[in-house]
């Protein structure tokens, strides 16, 4: 599991993206990097710009460097734009789609739901957050877990994302279930990232 020892709000501010709902409030009050010199402007080298973008992508999916490299290697073998393929690879992770569906509030919570054995795919328990969901796969909360308070909140829409549910998902929160209808399109994926900079970072 990726190292999450650094406070998530501070990490969010350092990367310039809100990784949790709580971080959104901090952005409104403190729209600058953490630390007493956070308000000052800094000139970043091309390398640092690419590194930051890579870290932003990693953080939004809560993956390790090794996991991101593997996803990049798979994406590089596909036709089309490598950067878009990379984001799509990450979006097909089980924990990412549990988050998108509204069953979980954050990527961290989604990961824990999977690791603790609360999620099944096509009727089989899956406890690996990195499991790659395929089109037509049906994902749902296991029967034995549905009465837990956390999932009662999810069933009532308490964790539903702002705006529309991504069109590549068919979600039934009352049933705590969703289906991946098709492969996501990069433009539909709610991730803040200039993926071309990530490609340039790894291609250097």
UniProtKB/Swiss-Prot annotation:
Example GO biological process: ribosomal small subunit biogenesis
Domain (S4 RNA-binding) ranges: 92-157
Keyword Protease attached: no
Record-linked SMART domains: Ribosomal_S4, S4
Pfam families to which the protein is assigned, alphabetical: Ribosomal_S4, S4
Keyword Ribosomal protein recorded: yes
A GO term, aspect molecular function: rRNA binding
Keywords: Ribonucleoprotein, Ribosomal protein, RNA-binding, rRNA-binding
Superkingdom of the organism of origin: Bacteria
SUPFAM superfamilies assigned to the protein according to its UniProt record, in alphabetical order: Alpha-L RNA-binding motif (SSF55174)
GO cellular component: small ribosomal subunit
Cross-referenced InterPro entries: Ribosomal_uS4, Ribosomal_uS4_bac-type, Ribosomal_uS4_CS, Ribosomal_uS4_N, S4_RNA-bd, S4_RNA-bd_sf
Subunit structure: Part of the 30S ribosomal subunit. Contacts protein S5. The interaction surface between S4 and S5 is involved in control of translational fidelity.
PANTHER family per UniProt: 30S 40S RIBOSOMAL PROTEIN (PTHR11831), SMALL RIBOSOMAL SUBUNIT PROTEIN US4M (PTHR11831:SF4)
Entries under NCBIfam families matching the protein: PRK05327.1, rpsD_bact
Function statement: One of the primary rRNA binding proteins, it binds directly to 16S rRNA where it nucleates assembly of the body of the 30S subunit. With S5 and S12 plays an important role in translational accuracy.
Family membership noted in the UniProt record: Belongs to the universal ribosomal protein uS4 family.
The protein, known as: Small ribosomal subunit protein uS4
């Amino acid at each position: 599991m990726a190292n999450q020892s650094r406070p998530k709000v501070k990490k969010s501010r350092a990367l310039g993206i809100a990784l949790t709902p709580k971080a959104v409030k901090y952005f409104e009050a403190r729209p600058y990097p953490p630390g007493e010199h956070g308000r000052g402007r800094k000139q970043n080298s091309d390398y640092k710009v690419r590194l930051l973008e890579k870290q932003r992508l990693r953080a939004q999916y809560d993956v390790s460097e090794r996991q991101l490299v593997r996803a990049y290697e798979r994406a590089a073998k596909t036709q089309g734009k490598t950067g878009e393929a990379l984001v799509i690879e990450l979006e097909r992770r089980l924990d990412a789609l549990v988050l998108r569906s509204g069953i979980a509030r954050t990527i961290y919570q989604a990961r824990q739901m999977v690791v603790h054995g609360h999620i099944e795919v096509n009727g089989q328990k899956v406890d690996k957050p990195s499991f790659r969901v395929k089109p037509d796969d049906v994902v749902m909360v296991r029967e034995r877990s549905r009465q837990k308070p956390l999932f009662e909140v999810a069933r009532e829409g308490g964790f539903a994302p702002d705006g529309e549910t991504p069109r590549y998902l068919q979600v039934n929160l009352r049933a705590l279930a969703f289906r991946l209808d098709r492969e996501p399109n990069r433009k539909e994926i709610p991730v803040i990232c200039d993926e071309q900079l990530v490609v340039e970072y790894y291609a250097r």
